[in-house]
Regions:
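Flexible coil/loop and intrinsically disordered segments
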Residues: 1-321
Length: 321
């Protein structure tokens, strides 16, 4: 039919929703998860309602991501998502890009930023992690999105489990992968690479002791409390991002995803930042060796030296400043 043509990831969403049949509750909850992840320029946690006062009952966000939004190992999250029984949504709304905002509170302080990949490529990364692919096996051509997912051979249980996994990886992505700021703000400058995470805050309005504590999730605090480690990780990740700019060249990111997923239970540990930095430095050296030297271990001549080598040297000079 005439009109706007659906993108491949929207068709994929429709194929998955079809697996729920007449089960409107599960279909609606699936759509909530998918839409939250597809709002790619916003932290996924911000797309779920949270309590406004400390004395209130936990809402979706706390139930899924934990009190301080640091839970990455959640399971059975369909039980934690609200179902709006009388909600009526047009098919265009369900398949479209805008999440239903009447049931969520949207923070304003996460700013405007650009991710290192787009949503279709992210889906391919998540699928490959889900299937346990090695780095050399992962396919990142978004034209193959529908074929790689092969939904006709998947059942409802697979869709539910994959959507939970998708949300898990998006939450990790939001907090542990660099982004590039599109605007100046109190916590970052335009065009600056940054690594910040959602953080729990509570305060009493106007500093009055008798007032209820207001609670918020703010997105302006560095992911790692050690500023030197946070800066190192930003420089290492951004070095890969500015070298391999095409979505289909983001295997470097897949290696990082694999590492983060393997260490999902350690992400909140105090020493994890140093462990993560060490992993990235070893990865950077490996990439440099593969690109700086010929097969007989000689340094490549000027015309054959790839861009990555210059970016790597910049990092080494910064570290040894």
């Amino acid at each position: 039919s005439r009109g706007e043509q659906l993108e491949a990831h929207e068709i994929l969403k429709a194929q998955m929703m079809a697996k729920f049949g007449a089960d409107q509750e599960m279909a609606q909850k699936f759509a909530r998860i998918w839409d939250a992840c597809a709002e790619f320029d916003k932290p996924v946690s911000s797309q779920f309602k949270m309590r406004r006062k400390r004395a209130d009952d936990f809402q979706e966000r706390e139930r899924i991501f934990g009190w301080h939004f640091t839970n990455y190992s959640f399971h059975n999250i369909y039980d934690d998502i609200d179902f709006y029984q009388n909600e009526r949504r047009k098919l265009s709304d369900i398949l479209g890009k805008k999440i239903n905002e009447k049931n969520i509170e949207v923070e304003k302080d996460f700013g405007d930023y650009t991710q290192v990949i787009d949503f279709p490529t992210f889906l391919l990364h998540v699928l490959a992690i889900w299937e346990g692919k090695d780095t050399n096996e992962v396919q990142l051509d978004d034209k193959k999105l529908l074929a790689l997912f092969d939904i006709k051979n998947k059942n409802k249980t697979w869709i539910i489990e994959f959507s939970e996994f998708l949300l898990k990886i998006k939450h990790i992505f939001d907090n542990y992968i660099v982004r590039n700021s599109n605007m100046d703000s109190s916590s970052r400058n335009k065009d600056e690479w940054f690594l910040q995470k959602g953080t729990y805050y509570e305060y009493q309005p106007n500093g009055k002791a008798k007032e209820h504590y207001i609670v918020e999730e703010r997105f302006t605090k560095n992911t790692f409390s050690d500023s030197e480690i946070n800066k190192n990780i930003i420089l290492l990740q951004s070095m890969f991002a500015v070298t391999f700019t095409a979505n289909r060249d983001s295997r470097w990111l897949y290696e990082i995803f694999q590492f983060l997923f393997r260490h999902i239970e350690e992400l909140n540990d105090q020493e994890f930042g140093a462990h993560f930095k060490e992993f990235l430095e070893k990865m950077a050296v490996t990439y440099a060796e593969e690109r700086l030297f010929t097969e007989d271990r000689r340094i490549k001549k000027y015309g054959a030296i790839p861009v990555y080598a210059f970016n790597f040297v910049d990092y080494v000079l910064w570290k040894n400043r």
